[in-house]
């Protein structure tokens, strides 16, 4: 992906927003030792958001490397809903914001997105969690997508439990329970807080969901 118009981040400096953005009230945790690489989560993600099963439109990514050995042959890459979200801070049109109506999840308003790619460049993770794809709903213009914890879908989460059993689509369909949702802020250092052993008693004592 090459940003459509390079230079927005140089023109509009939004660093003053950093630290003033409220933390998300929800996070996705994954256990790559459980993941089988079936991509059910990717298909479910696109089905509930776009109405089609298309991995290219998925907000959660399964990365497979046949040259690696277990458990590094398959990994799950999900948006971290960062406590200090650089993607939100650099968006020049306020298309990417912490949505208070959905627990401050970092969401993209595609009607405001101009496809500049600033959020993709600002994301500290590889592959970047925001993904730019041509959108047929907007004359095939580039629009960015990222995980919104199924906000504004039947699988959204809220204080009342949200969708079916309060589960996001990816959590609901995973056949090996490799994906879990938590309201506790994970450790904000690399993968340590997000890629966890979901069977471990230490996580149960801390109040994290395990399977």
Regions found by a protein language model. Give the residues of each.
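Phosphate- and divalent-cation-binding pockets in alpha/beta enzyme and binding domains
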Residues: 44-45, 90
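Interfacial segments of alpha-helical transmembrane regions
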Residues: 106-108
């Amino acid at each position: 992906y090459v940003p459509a118009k390079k230079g927005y981040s140089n023109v509009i400096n939004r660093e003053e927003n950093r630290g003033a953005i409220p933390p998300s009230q929800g996070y996705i945790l994954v256990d790559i030792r459980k993941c089988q690489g079936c991509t059910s989560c990717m298909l479910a993600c696109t089905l509930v958001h776009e109405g089609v099963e298309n991995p290219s439109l998925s907000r959660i990514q399964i990365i497979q490397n046949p040259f690696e050995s277990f458990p590094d042959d398959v990994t799950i890459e999900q948006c971290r809903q960062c406590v200090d979200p650089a993607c939100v801070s650099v968006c020049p049109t306020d298309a990417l914001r912490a949505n208070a109506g959905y627990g401050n999840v970092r969401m993209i308003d595609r009607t405001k997105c101009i496809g500049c790619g600033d959020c993709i460049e600002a994301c500290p993770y590889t592959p970047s969690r925001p993904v730019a794809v041509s959108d047929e709903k907007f004359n095939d213009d580039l629009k960015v997508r990222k995980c919104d914890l199924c906000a504004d879908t039947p699988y959204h989460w809220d204080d009342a439990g949200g969708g079916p059993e309060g589960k996001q689509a990816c959590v609901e369909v995973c056949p090996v329970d490799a994906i879990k949702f938590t309201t506790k802020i994970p450790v904000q250092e690399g993968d340590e807080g997000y890629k966890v052993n979901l069977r471990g008693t230490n996580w149960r004592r801390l109040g994290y969901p395990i399977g």
